[in-house]
Amino acid sequence: MIYKVFLDTNILLSGIFFDGNESKILDVVELNLVTSEDAVDELRRAVKKKLKYLTERTIEIALAETEKALSDIVIVPRAKYTHKLKEAETLMKYKKDIPILAAVLYIEPDYFLTGDMHFFTDQIKKIVNVINARDFLPRIK
């Protein structure tokens, strides 16, 4: 079975730049990987922030690597899920990630992969299958 899997920013960042469960997930061909415009914007900001002390060329290479990794992932435009912002706001108080949850509500993935614990509430877990990378890998093997 091919699962539709929404990837949060922290999963993308770890999967692109580090070896581990997240990078293994990005390499699984049998998954329909999806993320949101907001997650991608956050990813690009995080890459620039984490590498700000390195040379401009190193940052360019890291951003190019990011774009290459994103080429295999469906990126849902913000305009598609803005109507879900109010619903997301009722489920979560962590304002920064309300757009991410709105995208998840719109996309309705089989799994929502994240390392952010504020998504692992009973209220959110009733609506979407929230899971971390470590627990997700055994399910698809």
PLM feature spans:
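Short, well-structured N-terminal submotif of metal-dependent ribonuclease cores
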Residues: 1-36
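Acidic active-site catalytic centers that drive phospho-/nucleotidyl reactions
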Residues: 8, 97, 116
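Alpha-helix capping/helix-boundary segments
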Residues: 12, 39, 100, 118-119, ...
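Short, solvent-exposed loop/turn segments at secondary-structure junctions
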Residues: 15, 83-86, 121-122
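Short, glycine/charged-enriched secondary-structure capping and boundary segments
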Residues: 19-22, 27, 48-49, 126-129
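PIN-domain endoribonuclease scaffold, especially VapC-family toxins
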Residues: 28-29, 34-86
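Active-site neighborhoods of divalent-metal-dependent phosphate/nucleic-acid chemistry enzymes
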Residues: 72-111
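Acidic, PIN/NYN-like endoribonuclease modules and their adjacent C-terminal/linker elements
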Residues: 105-113, 117-141
